[in-house]
A protein has these predicted regions:
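Conserved alpha/beta enzyme-core scaffold
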Residues: 1-162
Length: 162
């Protein structure tokens, strides 16, 4: 998630309830003050990863691959030597590990189960095919849907018309 919202009641703020979430993995929490409160109070587990890493990792999860291998994040807050992107004390699982490939140090962002993908589309047909033709941006909708589907999760799509 890139934590979309309006800093009030829209976007991911709608899901900012400890009873609804166990964990969030996001690029930032700027637009969701309610999510920030859950993270600060240790009500949910929270990871902060670079947005591009999240998008690429969702593609890897959707494809059933063993995670994302990259140099992105080395030496930063997502490096396991610097906290592994964990945003609070109740977040304990290691989702990032150091590995060596061909003599170079890389990070492996481990795959995880995606329980839900909540997306926006323009049109859908009765078979579940969705068109994004009039959406402003697709933000890797296909990768998110595939990651949820292949994790055994659910895909919800809001559309204008069927």
């Amino acid at each position: 998630s890139l934590v979309i919202g309006d800093r009030d009641s829209k976007g991911t703020n709608r899901f900012a309830h400890a009873e609804m979430l166990k964990r969030i993995i996001a690029g930032h929490f700027t637009w969701s003050p309610k999510m920030q409160e859950l993270v600060k109070s240790n009500a949910i587990e929270a990871y902060c990863f670079p947005g591009g890493v999240i998008q690429a990792l969702l593609r890897e999860i959707g494809a059933g691959r063993p995670g994302l291998f990259t140099h992105v994040g080395l030496g930063s807050f997502v490096d396991p030597r610097n906290g592994g992107g964990k945003s609070n004390e109740c977040t304990t699982d290691d989702l990032v590990e150091l590995i060596e490939i061909d003599g170079e140090t890389k990070l492996r962002y481990r795959p995880f189960k995606v329980d839900y993908a909540i997306l926006r589309g323009t049109y859908a047909d009765p078979r579940g095919n969705v068109s994004l033709e009039e959406e402003a941006i697709d933000m890797d909708s296909y990768s998110m849907a595939l990651a949820a589907h292949n994790s055994g999760g659910k895909v919800f799509v809001q559309v204008r018309d069927v």
